Structures are given as structure tokens and as C-alpha cells.
Amino acid sequence: MGVAGVAIDTVEDMARLFDGIALDRTTVSMTMNGAVLPIMAAFVVAAEEQGVPPERIGGTIQNDILKEYMVRNTWIFEPEPSMRIVADVALWLARHAPRFNALSVSGYHFQEAGADAVLELALTLSNGRAYVDTLAARGMPADEACSRLSFFFGVGSDFYTEIAKLRAARLLWTEIAHACGARSARACALRMHCQTSGWSLTAQEPENNIVRVTAQAMAAAFGGTQSLHTNAYDEALALPSAAAARLARNTQLILQHETGLCDTVDPWAGSYMMESLTDGIATRVRAELAAIDAQGGVIAAIESGWVKRRLLHAAAETQAQVDSGRRTVVGVNRYVASDPTDAFMVREMDGRHVRAGQMRRIAAVKAARDPARVATALRRLADAARDGAGNLLALAIDCMRARATVGECTRALESVWPRHAAAVDANGEGAYGDHRRGDAAWRAATGRVGRLARRTGRRPRIVIAKLGQDGHDRGAAVVAAALEDAGFDVLRLPLFQQPASVAAAAQAHGADIVGISSLSGAHLELVEGLLDELALHRAGMPVVLGGIFPAADARHLKAKGIAATFGPGTPLDAIAQALCACIEQARCARPADGAS
């Protein structure tokens, strides 16, 4: 807790977050999807208690639940009730808080999950179209529905393609909005926010990321973004330091105020190269939109696993290109520093301390409230979910006024709607290995896995899991696909595991090794908990950790018993070799352990 966002459980938390900030003079953007009802409600109530009525608040709530089922995974309920929540939030804000945008349709997460420019646009625009259809079914006119959407795109390092992508997005959205019945200029204009690529940041020589972010920010400006977030150069290591965050902010200020970059609208218009690239992307996106329609629409494409498979294969191919050197990443697979250092100062947070403080604050809120009023408000929220009557955001606001917590609101809805149970898709046979055939390093890795399998009489078994609330699964999915192609027997567990459940699954599977993927900063507490669980059950399999973590944390976990750690940029052939070594070492140690 406290290492991947701010903890908001009550109105008091929201008020503390915005203490000293006048909410009638500040626009607020919140990335919230699964728990959008209580979080938006807490913000509305905190503003009210600051003296700012709903009609005077401004900002954006992401409220883009469809992409959560595809990539980010912060869903709670099944798609159907979740789409009702999306619509209720949009309808309430349209009536009571018209300056607050109800939907920010995200393509950024698709790029982070592996999508190229075409697939990113197709999935994003398809989701936008689905939201407009949902709002239209609830009685909102097409012009109003389309005008209440904004879009959020990632901007990577393929400079010209990224500019063309943003230009094509505006063209395509105009076509979609018009097809939905919109006619006003505002409804047919695509409003966008962009963020530089997180996936492209490297832990090796992180100063190089300053150049990457600058080039990406230039592409976003040339492409016509209305607002921009520039990532900090040290985000591949940990939470950004204050100095790195300031430099990221200043990067776009320098581009805006010192270069003249923003003085001309669409400066690439008329370039044969740019116009043909834009037209080509738009044509390919239209074909992808038709393919989604052929699946039965975007929700059907989610439920069939079509979207996840497309993203996995795209991400695996990209990783194979990097690992083989066919795609250059300076400082990682070419022009590598001869004396790499990990001496960067990174921001550290004590999650246990943050959680203890948060629990005390929640207890204080509960002690001061009227329990009967809370129970009545929560019951009305659940009743509205059950019978379909009433606006869920309005009722969630009543709950937060009574000082219900975010968790209590969620549990009230959960009493009516069961949690979404996401299936773990197949690892995608050949998704990675097919792109490395003939590669000497890959042949060496698969050869070692094969020799280990012949010695033991079966393929080496690995369980891959993500612990806690970490929903970023691109890395885990690609590693699972690559290891299966290398010859491992891979069991990839569903998201949001606890140490005890991973230990039980590893024992039931007869695993030789357990791999944990961590991108949320919660690795210390959770991985140590897993080691304790395995020790409790006398399970001798080694545990390895991959993801983003400071070097000091890696050393700490190795001292606690982790067999190996793999940071960003580790080639998957090297990971396969290291896993074999860990398994072999553990097997050699078992007789001695048994004798003791």
C-alpha cells in the first residue's frame, strides 16, 4: 500500500488528498475504473464539504471498464453490470456535473500490453463506440454521448508512426461518431490526452530515457494532443524521484515554450510521407474494426479471448525481436555500457507503515459515524443494483455522505453481482519461439531445457503468478509463452493471488520452481510471505522474482532465500537458462536437506 498510488478508502482520505486545493478552480483527472462508483462519490462529497457543488467541479474520470477486461485487469464485476455502472456515472455527471468528463477511453494500456499503432487504435475506438451505444440505449442523444468522451493514447518511439496514429485517430473518430448519429462539431472532434511510453523505459542506463521521453513528447505534440504526461526517466527502477518528476514536467514545458513546436496546427499536413502513412493506418484500423464486429462486437471479442490472444502474440513478437537484437534498444541489446551501475537513488516507501496508518484512519471514521445510516444507505445501493432502478452513482454518493468506505460499497454491490472470474488464456504456442528459430542463444536455452527434461523424465515445471493487487500481466504472459516454447511445463495462475494460494498451487502441480512477476512495488512483503508459506509446508522448490524493483530489494530478497531475480531487459533465453540452473541446484540439495 502506498507504493503504486494513493490509498482512498473514505471521504476523509479524499479531503486530505485535496487539502488546500480549491476544487472549483482545479480540474482533476482520476484513473479509476472498477471502483469508480465509491471513488467518484467520495470526490463529489469531499468537494461538497469544501463548499464546491457538483456543477462547479471539473475534470475527468477514466471509467473505461472494457479495457480492464483486455489489459489492465482492475475489474470487479462481470461486463454487463459494469457497463451499467459506466452509464450511471456518465448520466449522473451529465446532469449534475457537466464540467466533469465521464469517460476517458484508453489506448495507452493497449500499447503497454504490446499492441502496435493499428491494434491500439482499433481496440480504443471500438470501446468508444460501445460506450456511445450503451449511453444511447439509456436515452442520451448521440451528440451528447460522443461529446462526453475523451481519449487517452500512448506515444512510443516510432516517431512518424505515432504522429500518423494520432492524426488517423481523429479521422476515424469522426467517421464513427457520424455513423452513431452525431452531427455537432464537438461530438465529432476527438479530444485526446497522451502519455509517453512506459514500456520503452529501460532500467539499464536510465538517463537514456530522457531522450526517449523527449522524442515521444515531440511526436505527441506534432500529432495534436491536447494534454500530455511525460514519464520520469527512473520509472523503470521504482517510483519516480522528485528530481526526475520535475525533469519530466520541464521536458514538455521546454518543448512548449522554447521550441515553437506548438505554434502551428498539424504541421505535417501535406507531407506525402505523413499523409500516406496516416491513410495506411486508417485503412488497417478499419479492417481491424470489421474483424471485431465479426467476433460479435467488442464484448464478445473479450469473452472469447480474441483480444487477449492478439495482444499476447504482439507482445511476444516484440520481446523476441528485442531479445534477438532485431529491434535495437540502446543500452540494452546494443551499445551496452561496459561498466553498468545501479547506484541510482530511488524513492522508497514503507508499505507496512502506510497500511497501518490507513487502518487507523478507517477505524476512526467508522467509530464516528452513525451505523444505522450507513446500513440503510448500503442496503439502498444493493437494492438498486438488484432491481435496476435508480442511479448507482447517486446512491453511492449517499453512502459516502454517511461515511461508508470504498470497500463497504463494493461489498454491497458484490452481494448482488458476483465478482468477475477471468480465465487464464493459453500461453500461446509459438507466440515467442516462432520468432527466434535459428537464433543461437535460443537454441542453447531450449537445448538445456531439453537435457534437463531427459534427465528427470518430464518437462521442468514452473508456476508463474502475480501476488496481491498487481494487474499488469504483460510480462508474466510473455514469459509464460516463451518458457512453454522453450520446453517448460507452465502453469500460469489467475491474477490477484495470495502467498498461501500460490504455495498450494505449486505443491499441487508438482512444480520444480515458482516464478513471481511484480510490477506494483509490493514484492518485499508478499514474496517473503510466499517463502514463509513454502517453508511451512516443507516445499523445497526455489522461488524467482521478475519485474521492477530496486537493486537493494533484490539483494534483500536473495538474502531471504530467493534463488534469482530478473530485472527489466533480461533476455528470455537467459531466464530459461537461469531457471534450469536453479532447478538443478535445488535437486542436488534435496538429499542433504532430507538427511538433516
Which residue stretches match the model-derived regions?
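Alpha-helix capping and helix-loop boundary segments enriched in small/acidic/polar residues
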Residues: 1-9, 30-34, 70-84, 109-123, ...
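Catalytic alpha/beta active-site cores
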Residues: 1-156, 180-193, 221, 227-231, ...
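Generic, well-ordered alpha-helical scaffold segments in large soluble proteins
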Residues: 11-21, 42-46, 89-96, 124-138, ...
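Active-site capping/gating regions of soluble enzymes
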Residues: 122-127, 131, 150-334
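Short beta-strand/loop segments at the ligand-binding rim of alpha/beta enzyme cores
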Residues: 189-192, 458-461, 536-546
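Flexible, glycine-rich loop/tail regions that form catalytic "lids" or insertion modules at the edges
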Residues: 242, 253, 257-442, 507, ...
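Cofactor-cradling patches in redox/metallo enzymes
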Residues: 270, 476-583
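The C-terminal output helix
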Residues: 581-594
